[in-house]
Regions:
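Soluble or luminal CAZymes and related metallo-dependent hydrolases
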Residues: 51, 83-90, 179-183, 213-217, ...
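Short, solvent-exposed loop/turn segments at secondary-structure junctions
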Residues: 62-64, 110, 139, 167, ...
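Conserved alpha-helical substructure of the radical SAM core
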Residues: 5-158, 407
Length: 407
């Protein structure tokens, strides 16, 4: 009998119960991270090494739900676009054989892609690890649950983030489809049972968003997590920009028009900062009481919460996402970041190294450093906002802590 998966699972679970160990590991990772990016920021030339730390692959832009606050809503379910999804043979050629590279999968709803398990197998065979995948969980059937558990047992799949917005009926309303919560719960049960059977060290978290429709029930997410057998909650603060911030970003980028910006654009997000503060604090307190791990993105700490939820308020900080992660669409086209959809290359025509070191990518990174952050970056899940406390900077702003970013 192979005891390795069982041992890995036991060690991982034990480590998560030791706050001091967790803190020390996080601080070590932070110091490593700071050392790496220090060179990028000091040089200010926009270069970021030969290859990224990881790739975020938007496996599909098809989705089976209709979420009210989805920041990529305008990119979803475009007629016929699914035909551009890279076939597995093309996918093999498009991505480099680079053992140790991290890939993360998002969408859209990735399980709308029928060959998604084949996609993951391609990456596993290349020696990659999957840092996380995001899903709404509604179409995780027995076959997929077993396959995901097997990929976790083999050490490929590390973390699954399941998007949930509140208790049963509230979640259904936010997602725009009746019965969504029950289908998600059923998918999670299948996944957990399959992982337990294989003793697979698979982390599962629920991911929720600060939104007007669900704010009053935010603290109830702890009960939802316990009902679903999940011990971690990731919170995304609402991601949005004002029309003026979009226009200024377009000017700074020298873009032709605002079509390159993909975010929720509004002059009024409909959220009172005092209410947000109260509800987030209730959620954090309840997580502590119940032993539920908690993380949020971006790190909107007390000194900046009012400004964050006041449209037009200037926020400062930094974003290192384009220095660390390549954002690759289902068609192989690479974009500067999730919000700024300027094409920087195409993996069906260039190598990842050629894209990553290409002049378009380098020039945009250089412009980002010169500006600190662009106006549309101020309320993005990838940004590191200032001011922040030392505790706020413990978690490395890697592509996936617990909060996975809105799908």
């Amino acid at each position: 009998m192979d005891f390795a998966p069982r041992l890995r699972e036991a060690v991982a679970r034990r480590a998560r119960t030791l706050p001091l160990l967790t803190s020390l590991v996080a601080r070590y990772r932070r110091s490593q991270y700071e050392r790496r990016i220090d060179g990028f920021l000091k040089k200010q030339d926009g270069e970021a090494g030969r290859l990224p730390s990881g790739v975020v692959y938007e496996a599909t832009m098809r989705c089976n739900l209709h979420c009210e606050f989805c920041y990529v809503g305008t990119l979803l379910n475009i007629e016929g676009e699914w035909r551009e999804e890279l076939p597995l043979e093309v996918l093999k050629r498009a991505f480099p054989d680079e053992a140790g590279l991290q890939v993360s999968l998002t969408g859209g709803e990735i399980f709308m892609r029928k060959d998604i398990l084949g996609v993951m197998e391609v990456f596993r065979e290349k020696g990659y690890t999957c840092g996380y995948l995001t899903t709404n969980g509604t179409i995780i059937n027995d076959e997929r649950a077993e396959a995901l558990a097997d990929l976790a047992a083999k050490g490929f799949l590390k973390h699954i983030s399941v998007s949930i917005d509140g208790p049963n009926e509230l979640h259904d309303k936010a997602r725009g489809v009746k019965g969504t919560f029950e289908r998600t719960a059923a998918g999670l049960r299948r996944l957990q049972q399959a992982a337990a059977k294989r003793h697979a060290p698979l982390r599962v978290s629920v991911n929720t968003t600060v939104a007007h429709e669900t704010l009053d029930a935010l603290h109830e997410m702890v009960g939802v997590a316990e009902e679903l057998g999940v011990d971690a909650i990731g919170l995304n603060h609402l991601m949005y920009s004002t029309p003026a911030e979009v226009a200024e970003t377009v000017r700074l980028l020298g873009a032709a028009d605002a079509s390159v910006i993909s975010t929720f654009v509004t002059n009024d997000p409909g959220l009172n900062p005092a209410r947000v503060r109260t509800q987030v604090n209730r959620l954090v307190a309840r997580c502590r009481e119940r032993g539920i791990r908690f993380d949020m993105r971006p790190k909107v700490k007390e000194p900046i919460l009012d400004a964050y939820y006041t449209p037009g308020s200037a926020l400062t900080g930094r974003c290192l996402y384009p220095f660390l992660y390549a954002r690759v669409s289902f068609s192989g086209k690479a974009y500067f970041c999730p919000f700024i959809r300027i094409e920087v290359g195409d993996l069906t025509k260039q190598s990842l190294e050629e894209v990553w070191t290409g002049e378009t990518y380098v020039s945009l990174r250089r412009r980002l450093v010169e500006n600190g952050i662009f106006p549309v970056c101020r309320r993005c899940c990838k940004v590191e906002l200032a001011p922040g406390t030392a505790d706020a900077l413990v978690t490395v702003p890697a592509e996936e802590p617990l909060a996975a970013g809105a799908q």
